[in-house]
Amino acid sequence: MLVHPEAMSVGALADKIRKIENWPQKGILFHDITPVLQSAEYFRLLVDLLVYRYMDQKIDIVAGLDARGFIIGAALAYHLNVGFVPIRKKGKLPFETVSQSYALEYGEAAVEIHTDAVKPGSRVLLVDDLVATGGTMLAGLELIRKLGGEIVEAAAILEFTDLQGGKNIRASGAPLFTLLQNEGCMKG
């Protein structure tokens, strides 16, 4: 049974996200979603809020970004009765892959997807836990496009608006939906 979004507010999710100062480094206020995932009530709320948004949007596949996007994306795909595709850090997938690099604060990283994961013309929803600079999500969107997928939307629980990731994603031509927006993960 779905929890109707009006039964609990999105603000309840915000209250459940744990804030940890100076982690993983000094000056960062880390937003930890594990309390949401640990609670059957709040995890259901999170998934149901997304199900209600996407249940009538004719999605063919949900893709999730490594690693928390797997948790949210797989649960969402199950409820939408569609398949799930993992987009993993480079070197973690066993079959033929296509890769996309993206910039980090110091250096570069890459994500990969199996070459047969998205059929041309498939309508794809890309999911992650949060959007900071947007680099990982932009790389995931590019992988889906390389395989011929049509981006329905990119979705996340939380967007740090001051880091411009959401703006960059929207500028790439992909719509972005986030349940919560926050000024940022940098301590002021």
From Swiss-Prot:
Family annotation (PANTHER family): ADENINE PHOSPHORIBOSYLTRANSFERASE
Q: Give the chief site where it resides.
A: cytoplasm
From the UniProt record, list the reaction(s) this protein catalyses: AMP + diphosphate = 5-phospho-alpha-D-ribose 1-diphosphate + adenine
An example GO BP is:
AMP salvage
Q: Provide the top EC class.
A: transferase
The residues forming a coiled coil are none
User: Corresponding gene?
Assistant: apt
Q: What is this protein called?
A: Adenine phosphoribosyltransferase
Q: According to its UniProt record, in which pathway does this protein act?
A: Purine metabolism; AMP biosynthesis via salvage pathway; AMP from adenine: step 1/1
Q: List the source organism.
A: Neisseria meningitidis serogroup C / serotype 2a (strain ATCC 700532 / DSM 15464 / FAM18)
Main function: Catalyzes a salvage reaction resulting in the formation of AMP, that is energically less costly than de novo synthesis.
Q: Could you state one GO cellular component term attached to this entry?
A: cytoplasm
Its lineage opens with: Bacteria, Pseudomonadati, Pseudomonadota, Betaproteobacteria, Neisseriales
Q: Which UniProt keywords apply?
A: Cytoplasm, Glycosyltransferase, Purine salvage, Transferase
